[in-house]
Amino acid sequence: GESTGTVSTNPTAEFGEIKDEGIDISLPNDENWKSQISAMNDAEIRTLSTSVEGYDFEAVTRIDEIVTYFDNGDSLPNTNSDGEAVSNSVAIGDVFLVNRAGKVYLIEVTDVIATGSDNNDAIEFKIKH
């Protein structure tokens, strides 16, 4: 849907918080999808801090745990041409924390679907909030 970036994201979608960074038109069609995400609509995305040991998505059961992970999370490592923070190319198992207006949630990448012959590329997540 609009807020996950798995459907062609409208960058002005009112409820969207995660944006697919699209394609690199300088590359051939079968390898041009960036598979990167950025925040939209005043949301902020962070990665799980590299200092966290023994992390287990399934073991997270309370919102205060998610807020702590967000507060201690790392900024996204890249910047797009608009100056927005952008992830690396995502991979299965990557973990992100999202905060928009105090609504904080945890997402883990469960699948990255790259399609070379159409524009149906997608990133699928599990979510906890």
Where are these regions (language model features)?
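Generic structural motif
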Residues: I25, I45, Y105-I107, F125
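Short, solvent-exposed secondary-structure boundary/capping segments
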Residues: I113-H129
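Context-gated lysine
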Residues: K19, K34, K103, K126-K128
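N-terminal "domain-start" segment
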Residues: G1-E84
